[in-house]
């Protein structure tokens, strides 16, 4: 299994650091005059060339904040990341990446109903599966962490495969108000793309009514494989479905230098939200920033 990186920029910087570590000269066997040890800041490569190639607004000092410090030792050993390990010399321990993570496997949640007998959840059948269509803000569904696009595998021990939307809502209506047990798979139709702003604060894409319509050549968006004809579901884990483009742009502007988008193909998205009013999406969808 290969080492994993959140973005192409992380991969390139990581490769430079590893290459420099491998190229470090070994200590001579015969005694020699000891030169003064270089400061830790010089143990990592000069990133001027890399900055020019990627258009990143980053310095060696900024990268080093996200790297493990090398101990002061005469027997320094440069280690390579293990298979499957996520290495992020540029992104670091970014909260947006953590909030947007689509976890593999399935999980169980316990849902209840509010005083009106509502869960705050709407479901939609897609390709014989059952998916979360709407999570209303400040409801039991939002409190347990359900998100748009999550797949519902079971409700109270009953397999949901093949159910239509009407049956799903009927089962929820009849379920206990105190405890509804669901088995969930995280957003199988969605994927995340992590990008880095350039010196002008741009990552290189534009949207129209929530859909990605263009990607700038040579930008971080292009380098990291962002595609057109996809809708933006989340920015750094925050749901933006139903928001005006101006508001989404504001969220992107204030989101920091590392941006993680959660996107979904247009054909799936439009099927998921059919018969939902744009006003309902805008005013009732949970747009809060999730906990990590």
Swiss-Prot record:
It is found in: Cytoplasm; Nucleus, Nucleolus; Nucleus, Nucleoplasm; Cell membrane. It comes from the Eukaryota. Keywords: Cell membrane, Cytoplasm, Lipid-binding, Membrane, Nucleus, Repeat. The keyword Kinase does not apply. SMART domains: PDZ (SM00228). GO terms for cellular component: cytoplasm; cytosol; Golgi apparatus; nuclear speck; nucleolus; plasma membrane. It holds the Pfam family PDZ. GO terms for molecular function: phosphatidylinositol-4,5-bisphosphate binding; protein heterodimerization activity; protein homodimerization activity. The keyword Cell division does not apply. GO terms for biological process: cell population proliferation. Residues 108-187, 192-267 form the PDZ domain. Binds phosphatidylinositol 4,5-bisphosphate (PIP2). May play a role in the organization of nuclear PIP2, cell division and cell survival. The two PDZ domains mediate the interaction with phosphatidylinositol 4,5-bisphosphate (PIP2) and target SDCBP2 to the plasma membranes and nucleoli, PIP2-rich regions. Monomer and homodimer. Interacts with SDCBP. Interacts with TM4SF1. This is Syntenin-2. It comes from Mus musculus. The gene is Sdcbp2.
């Amino acid at each position: 299994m290969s080492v994993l990186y959140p973005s192409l920029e992380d991969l390139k910087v990581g490769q430079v650091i590893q290459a420099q570590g491998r190229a470090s000269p070994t200590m001579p066997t015969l005694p020699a005059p000891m030169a003064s040890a270089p400061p830790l800041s010089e143990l990592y490569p000069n990133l001027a060339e890399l900055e020019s190639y990627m258009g990143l607004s980053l310095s060696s000092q900024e990268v080093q904040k996200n790297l493990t410090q090398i101990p002061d030792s005469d027997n320094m050993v440069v280690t390579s990341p293990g298979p499957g390990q996520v290495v992020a010399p540029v992104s670091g321990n970014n909260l947006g990446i953590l909030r947007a993570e689509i976890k593999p496997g399935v999980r169980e949640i316990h849902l209840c109903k509010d005083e009106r007998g509502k869960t705050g959840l709407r479901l939609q059948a897609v390709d014989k599966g059952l998916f979360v269509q709407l999570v209303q803000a400040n409801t039991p569904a939002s409190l347990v962490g359900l998100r748009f696009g999550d797949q519902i595998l079971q409700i109270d021990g009953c397999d949901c495969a093949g159910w239509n939307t009407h049956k799903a809502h009927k089962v929820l209506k009849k379920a206990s108000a105190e405890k509804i047990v669901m088995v969930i798979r995280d957003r199988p139709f969605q994927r995340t793309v992590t990008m880095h702003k350039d010196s002008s604060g741009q990552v290189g894409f534009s949207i129209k009514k929530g859909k990605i319509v263009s990607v700038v050549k040579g930008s971080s968006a292009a380098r990291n494989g962002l595609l057109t004809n996809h809708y933006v579901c989340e920015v750094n884990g925050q749901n933006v479905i139903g928001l005006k483009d101006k508001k989404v742009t504001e969220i992107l502007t204030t989101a920091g230098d590392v941006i993680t988008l959660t996107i979904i193909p247009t054909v799936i998205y439009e099927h998921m939200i059919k018969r939902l009013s744009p006003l309902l999406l805008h005013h009732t969808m949970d747009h809060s920033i999730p906990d990590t």
